[in-house]
């Protein structure tokens, strides 16, 4: 099973396919975990319309080709074909894909860290779709597509919201009737958590401070922007709220 395979692979040099699935796109990187190197990366765009695959092996120029990809399942197949290509690929067979990591935007209150994906996790991600209707359904499409093609490969969900679940109640509760939280889980969740986690740990390392003793303000600046406050290695506040748009 996937769980047993994860246990067997611990301590092994793992090759991991990382997937960030949107409604009509699929970004990916293929990573050697021991060397901390990106072996290949790319993006499938316009899935379901006029699909294209952009692919680049590390150290080589990227190439974009038109591909017929009615669904994300075909997109994943093209990605795997590119990774196994005799001239541009980086692996010889699917057996070299040790795990798949999926970016999932909203994990609600339940997930405080990355988790191995099983049916219960998938069901809860679906439950959280009302909180992230543009993101979670697309993330689930990517998970289902990978499960269909690689049913025995362990898959992990990495949540944007997980890092911020250490916030105290005074930081995540709104000044609204409590029943809105009790019934609809309306509260501050925070996003860009994977970025905030990495940057805060890297900053502590660079200034020579133990992460558990760090006090930091972390900024994520990209397609979106957010700020978080870190105290003793734990997020205590963040600028984004119920949704990434707040």
Predicted regions: what they are:
Residues 13-17:
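Extreme N-terminal starter segment of soluble prokaryotic enzymes
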């Amino acid at each position: 099973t996937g769980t047993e395979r994860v246990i067997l692979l611990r301590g092994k040099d793992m090759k991991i396919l990382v997937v960030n699935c949107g409604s009509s796109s699929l970004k990916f990187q293929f990573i050697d975990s021991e060397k901390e190197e990106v072996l290949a990366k790319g993006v499938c765009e316009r899935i379901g319309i006029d699909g294209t695959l952009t692919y680049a092996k590390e150290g080589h120029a990227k190439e974009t080709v038109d591909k017929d990809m009615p669904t994300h399942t075909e997109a994943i197949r093209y990605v795997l074909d590119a990774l196994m290509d005799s001239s541009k690929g980086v692996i010889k067979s699917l057996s070299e894909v040790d795990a798949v990591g999926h970016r999932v935007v909203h994990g609600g209150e339940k997930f405080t860290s990355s988790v191995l994906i099983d049916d219960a996790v998938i069901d809860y991600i679906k439950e959280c779709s009302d909180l992230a209707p543009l993101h979670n359904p697309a993330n689930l499409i990517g998970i289902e597509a990978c499960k269909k093609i690689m049913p025995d490969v362990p898959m992990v969900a990495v949540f944007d919201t997980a890092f911020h679940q250490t916030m105290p109640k005074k930081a995540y509760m709104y000044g609204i009737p409590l029943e809105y939280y009790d019934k609809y889980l309306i509260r501050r969740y925070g996003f860009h958590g994977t970025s905030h986690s990495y940057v805060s740990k890297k900053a502590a390392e660079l200034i020579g401070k133990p992460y558990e003793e760090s006090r930091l303000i972390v900024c994520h600046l990209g397609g979106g922007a957010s700020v978080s406050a870190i105290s003793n290695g734990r997020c205590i506040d963040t600028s984004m709220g119920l949704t990434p748009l707040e």
